[in-house]
C-alpha cells in the first residue's frame, strides 16, 4: 500500500480502520491469575518505506505514567508488536503505551537486549488518540487507538518481506486490573512475551 507513506498519521489511522483487515488479540493464556479481557484489535500493512500497525482498545482502566524512551510502558495501558525477519535469529520488540511512549530493542532472548537509541526511536511515527501527555490511572469506559509507522531502514531493510513471524500483545501490568492478552498462544507457566518459538506467521497487505 504505497499510498500510506504519503498520508499524515491521523489519515493513516482512518485508512487502516476502514480498508485493512482487523484481528483480535484474544488469547488469555493465564486466565486463572489474570482473567480481565479488554477488547483489543489490530491491523497491519506495509507501505514503500514503513510498516504500519493500528490498534484499537476498549478498556475499563487507562494509565499512561511512563513518557520517556525505553521505560516500563508495559506497566501502563500498553500494546506490543514483536517481529522476526526471515532467516534471522534476532527479533525486534516494539512496546507502546496509549500516549505513544516507546520501549524498543532487538535481541536474541529476553536477557540480552540491544535497546534503540533516542534518535532511532524518533524515526518511529506515532498517532495516539489519547494525546502525548502522561496521566495517572483512570477508571471508567475508554476507547483508544494508536497508529505506528516503523521505517524499514530502522530494521535494516530497503523493502519489507510479504511474510514474517511475529506476535501482538495487549497488557497493563501495573493497573488495577493487570492483564496479558496475546494474539497467538504462548504455552508457558507465567506471562513471558519474549518467546519467539511461539511467534505466528504474519502475511502483510
Regions found by a protein language model. Give the residues of each.
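Structural preference for beta-rich elements and adjacent junctions enriched in aromatics
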Residues: 1-205
Amino acid at each position: 500500500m504505497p499510498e500510506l507513506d504519503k498520508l499524515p498519521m491521523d489519515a493513516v489511522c482512518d485508512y487502516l480502520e476502514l480498508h485493512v483487515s482487523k484481528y483480535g488479540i484474544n488469547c488469555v493464556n493465564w486466565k486463572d491469575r489474570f482473567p480481565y479481557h479488554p477488547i483489543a484489535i489490530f491491523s497491519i500493512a506495509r507501505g514503500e518505506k514503513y510498516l504500519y500497525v493500528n490498534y484499537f482498545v476498549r478498556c475499563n482502566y487507562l494509565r499512561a505514567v511512563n513518557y520517556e524512551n525505553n521505560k516500563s510502558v508495559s506497566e501502563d495501558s500498553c500494546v506490543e508488536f514483536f517481529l522476526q525477519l526471515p532467516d534471522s535469529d534476532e527479533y525486534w520488540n516494539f512496546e507502546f503505551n496509549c500516549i505513544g511512549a516507546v520501549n524498543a530493542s532487538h535481541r536474541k532472548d529476553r536477557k540480552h537486549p540491544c535497546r534503540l537509541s533516542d534518535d532511532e526511536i524518533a524515526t518511529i511515527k506515532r498517532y495516539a488518540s489519547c494525546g502525548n501527555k502522561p496521566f495517572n490511572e483512570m477508571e471508567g469506559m475508554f476507547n483508544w487507538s494508536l497508529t505506528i509507522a516503523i521505517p524499514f531502514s530502522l530494521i535494516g531493510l530497503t523493502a519489507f518481506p510479504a511474510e514474517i513471524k511475529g506476535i501482538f500483545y495487549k497488557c497493563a501490568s501495573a493497573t488495577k486490573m493487570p492483564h496479558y492478552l496475546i494474539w497467538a498462544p504462548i504455552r508457558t507457566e507465567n506471562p513471558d512475551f519474549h518467546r519467539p518459538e511461539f511467534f505466528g506467521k504474519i502475511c502483510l497487505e
